[in-house]
From Swiss-Prot:
Keywords: DNA-binding, Transcription, Transcription regulation. GO terms for molecular function: DNA-binding transcription factor activity; transcription cis-regulatory region binding. This is Uncharacterized HTH-type transcriptional regulator Rv2282c. One of its GO terms (cellular component) is cytosol. Pfam families: HTH_1, LysR_substrate. The keyword Plastid does not apply. PROSITE patterns: HTH_LYSR. Belongs to the LysR transcriptional regulatory family. PANTHER family: HTH-TYPE TRANSCRIPTIONAL REGULATOR, HTH-TYPE TRANSCRIPTIONAL REGULATOR CYSL. Residues 8-65 form the HTH lysR-type domain. Gene3D superfamilies: Periplasmic binding protein-like II, Winged helix-like DNA-binding domain superfamily/Winged helix DNA-binding domain.
Length: 312
């Protein structure tokens, strides 16, 4: 029989469950990669549709009503079944496929994917299993998201500060941005610390717009200085970490780079890390796919299970 018009869609239940788990609209918004206003509107729409108050907004967050507690339990069960169905449909689509099209941001493609792929191959060979063929394309995070959405890639890896909406995702690794300069730079010689505001006002060597590293630095500066923070235009925009590194070594200016990409430079003193007090430059690296919270069954899920087991 058809569902009642009072029955919300799965997205509404997913947002409401995120509110219940986070305890606030803001926490749910951060978890889902939405604005707090969008989450608030969706909750109000859901309450109007079903005709029941689900949560009470307080100064300390969002408190579920008795009805909201019951609906949250139902939502968890419903989404668990939906994830199983979604994963099963994905299994039907990918059954027998031994080729995985992967698109990854450059830092992940260069610094992490080779190790993950080699260790997966070794593990599969030890078990006597079939080794899937991984076709890897390196790009920036924005293009990786678009490739997964458009079906060009089966799996993506990104560095963005927030998970993209409408895609499943899981954290697969953690990284840290490091502001670096060559040994002769003025920041390397002075005793006074560099502030977050001074960093924001300094022209930097950067990656191209919408790259994960550039977006992560901007997000960290806004968290520290406020949403109205003004950032100086870059002195150079380059399309690869290698080009950024070379420009910094040549004296073009400071840059924020992945610690994964410059570990040797820091160890041997070719580049020096600049401490920026109160600026949180730690970040999460994510895998993304089309579908729900559970990745598609088969080779894709096996690859992600292998990666996450190594990162824990």
């Amino acid at each position: 029989m058809p569902l009642s018009s009072r029955m919300p869609g799965l997205t509404c239940f997913e947002i409401f469950l995120a509110i219940a788990e986070a305890g606030s609209l803001g926490g749910a918004a951060r978890e889902l990669g939405l604005t707090q206003q969008a989450v608030s509107r969706r909750l109000a729409s859901m309450e109007a549709q079903i005709g029941v108050r689900l949560a009470i907004r307080t100064t300390r967050g969002s408190q579920l009503t008795p009805a909201g507690i019951v609906v949250a339990e139902w939502a968890a069960r419903l989404l668990e079944v939906a994830d199983e169905i979604d994963a099963g449909l994905g299994s039907l689509r990918t059954e027998g496929r031994q080729r995985i099209r992967v698109v990854a941001s450059q830092t992940i493609a260069e610094q992490l994917m080779p190790h993950w792929m080699l260790s997966l191959r070794a593990a599969d060979m030890r078990r006597g299993g079939t080794v899937p063929e991984v076709i890897l394309t390196a790009t920036n995070s924005e293009h990786a998201i678009a490739a997964v959405r458009d079906g060009i890639a089966d799996l993506g890896f990104i560095e963005n500060p927030c998970p993209p909406t409408g895609l499943g995702s899981v954290v697969v690794a953690r990284d840290e941005l490091v502001v670096v300069v060559p040994p002769g730079h003025k920041w390397a010689r002075r005793s006074r610390v560099v502030s977050a505001r001074e960093l924001a006002q300094t022209p930097l060597v950067t990656r191209e717009p919408n790259s994960g590293i550039r977006d992560s630095l901007t997000a960290a500066l806004r968290d520290t200085l406020g949403e109205d923070m003004q950032q100086a235009p870059p002195v150079l925009e380059l399309s690869s970490a290698a080009a950024v590194r070379a420009a910094v070594l040549a004296g073009a200016g400071p840059a924020a780079m992945s610690r994964l990409a410059i570990a040797d430079d820091l160890a041997f003193g070719r580049l020096l890390a600049v401490d920026i007090p109160a600026l949180n430059l730690r970040r999460q690296l994510r895998a993304i796919w089309v579908g729900g919270r559970t990745p598609p069954a088969g080779a894709i899920r096996d690859l992600l299970s292998h990666i996450t087991s190594r990162s824990t």
